[in-house]
Amino acid sequence: MIQPQSYLNVADNSGARKLMCIRVLGGGRQTATIGDVIIAVVKDALPNMPLKKSDVVRAVIVRTSKGVRRENGMMLCFDDNAAVVINKEGNPRGTRVFGPIARELRDRNFTKIVSLAPEVV
């Protein structure tokens, strides 16, 4: 579960390395899980890349340490909290996605991110 002030790793090559959640979008909820869109600020970035430190971006959460429970009763947990930076239309800003991605993103219509992922769990 991600809430405001939570730090996340970035799972793409958009130029950002660390994000801090500042708002969870949709329905006035306080926490976000896999597939939810957040507004975040870039806390650490690579030099000479489009995204700079202190840029405000939208991101979709692709991995959480808390995990999600699936319909068949299986609990899916990851080692870290990670997100992919997206634009207003929901397309990823980067061209590559690193690490495993949860299958729940396909149900939330983030098919472009799922197609870029090396592994869908």
From Swiss-Prot:
Cellular component aspect of the GO annotation: chloroplast; cytosolic large ribosomal subunit
Pfam families tied to this protein: Ribosomal_L14
UniProt KW keywords: Chloroplast, Plastid, Ribonucleoprotein, Ribosomal protein, RNA-binding, rRNA-binding
GO molecular function terms listed in the Swiss-Prot or TrEMBL record: large ribosomal subunit rRNA binding; structural constituent of ribosome
GO biological process, one term: translation
Chief site of localization: plastid
Record localization: Plastid, Chloroplast
Family recorded in the similarity comment: Belongs to the universal ribosomal protein uL14 family.
Function summary: Binds to 23S rRNA.
Quaternary state and interactors: Part of the 50S ribosomal subunit.
Protein name per the record: Large ribosomal subunit protein uL14c
Name of the encoding gene: rpl14
